[in-house]
Structure formats: structure tokens, C-alpha cells
């Protein structure tokens, strides 16, 4: 039976063994509990650190751009937590920099023929543990408590199919301008729908990021971008230390 919580990786056995060993060391960590969080860098490998560096890099590009942050396909929510922390660093009093995360929290809702035939293209793939959205909400709420304006909730988790939730959110929040949109749905249909929905709400300087462009395992993401924006109309860039993430700045 397919493990629908699993992800596709491209590492070899030696790398997997090293990662598993590091995880065991984390579980056995002898650091006092009140000092563990301030020493999490002890367990960061280069791959995971590079993604954090990218999030910092891309967040800096929107500090002077008005608008909220959208993440499409948040899964375990690491990016949401990072964006909340980065907001606390760069603009702690910006109550308008709301972070909105969209996810079914139950895996892929459906597969389109344009999503290809990769082994990951299975309904329900990339599912999460039960009630994970509630846990994630608690984590991000706690992060916000450690920053200014903690009495104002500046994040929202939208649980459900992005095809439906994007219209619902924008109808409920007609004032929405988007400074950063991060796409990690992996799928054609919700990516295309959400690109179409947010396009009129992007401003010059807004940043649009993708996790799976030019990826044979997730061809639908590229096709969605081609159909909504056209590759000839955007300047796709990549961060030199992260292989898979692409982005463009609205010009």
C-alpha cells in the first residue's frame, strides 16, 4: 500500500542514513529543555538551511510592497511559521501583512490528466496526521505571541480544496492585495485556478514563487503558469542555493 504521507526524494542511501542518524541525535538531545529552541541550528543540514535562507531572501523583497502573503499548499506549515518569524524581524508592527495558508490538510483532492503519471499523482497523496491544522494553528499563534501586536491575529489557515477556498476568501476579504504568493500545490487544477484568482490582485513588485516548476514529477504546475501568465511574459529566476524553487517579480 502506498504511504500517502511519504514524499519523493532524490537522495541516495548514504544521505538517508545520515539524515536518520541526525534525527536520532535530535531525539536524544541532552540540551536542557529551556535551551533547545535557541539551539535548533545544531540540527540543520545544508539542504534545510538553504530553504530557510531562501525564505529570508524572498521575504526581504516584499518588505516595501503592500499586501498579504498567500501560501498555496502549506502542508506541515514550516513556511507559514518562517513568514511569521520574518515578519517579526523585518516589520513587527505591520498588522496588514497577514499570512494566509491554503491546504486540504488531507492530501491531493483530485488528479488532472495534466498532472502526469508520477507515482506521487494519487488522490490523497501528501496527506497529514489527523487534526494537524489545529496543531499548526497553535504553533503559529504561539509564534505571534512572541512578537509585537500579539493581540491581533495576523494569520489564517484555509482548510479545503484551493479551487473553492480562494474564491471564498477573496469574497470575504475584498480588500486583498497580494505581495507574495507561494505555490506548492504540485497540481495543475488548483494552481491554475488560484493563479487566475490572484492575478488582478498582484501589484508591480509582488513576488510569485513556485516549488515545482520544470519538474517532471509535477508537470501541471508549469502548465498552469504557461496558461495563465505565459512563460514569455515573466522573468523566471532561481535562488542559487536551492535547486527546485523558482520565482518571478511582477513588472
What is the role of each PLM region?
Residues 2-10, 14:
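Leucine-rich tandem repeat or coiled-coil scaffolds
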Residues 53-64:
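Conserved alpha-helix/loop element of class I SAM-dependent methyltransferases that forms part
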Amino acid at each position: 500500500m502506498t504511504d500517502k504521507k511519504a514524499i519523493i526524494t532524490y537522495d541516495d542511501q548514504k544521505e538517508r542514513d545520515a539524515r536518520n542518524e541526525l534525527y536520532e541525535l535530535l531525539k536524544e538531545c541532552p540540551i536542557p529543555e529551556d535551551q533547545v529552541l535557541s539551539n535548533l541550528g545544531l540540527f540543520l543540514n545544508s539542504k534545510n538551511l538553504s530553504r530557510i535562507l531562501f525564505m529570508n531572501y524572498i521575504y526581504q523583497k516584499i518588505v516595501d510592497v503592500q499586501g498579504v502573503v498567500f501560501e498555496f499548499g502549506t502542508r506541515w506549515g514550516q513556511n507559514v511559521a518562517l513568514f511569521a518569524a520574518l515578519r517579526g524581524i523585518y516589520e513587527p508592527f505591520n498588522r496588514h501583512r497577514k499570512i494566509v495558508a491554503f491546504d486540504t490538510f488531507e492530501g491531493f483532492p483530485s488528479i488532472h490528466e495534466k498532472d502526469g503519471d508520477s507515482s506521487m499523482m494519487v488522490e490523497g497523496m501528501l496527506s497529514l496526521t489527523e487534526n494537524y491544522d489545529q496543531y499548526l494553528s497553535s504553533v503559529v499563534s504561539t509564534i505571534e505571541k512572541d512578537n509585537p501586536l500579539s493581540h491581533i491575529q495576523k494569520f489564517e489557515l484555509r482548510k479545503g480544496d484551493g479551487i473553492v477556498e480562494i474564491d471564498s476568501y477573496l469574497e470575504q476579504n475584498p480588500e486583498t492585495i497580494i505581495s507574495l504568493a507561494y505555490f506548492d500545490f504540485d497540481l495543475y487544477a488548483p494552481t491554475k485556478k488560484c493563479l487566475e484568482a490572484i492575478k488582478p490582485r498582484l501589484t508591480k513588485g509582488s513576488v510569485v514563487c513556485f516549488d515545482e516548476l520544470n519538474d517532471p514529477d509535477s508537470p501541471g504546475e508549469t502548465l498552469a503558469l504557461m496558461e495563465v501568465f505565459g512563460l514569455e511574459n515573466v522573468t523566471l529566476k532561481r535562488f542559487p542555493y536551492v535547486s527546485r524553487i523558482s520565482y518571478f517579480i511582477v513588472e
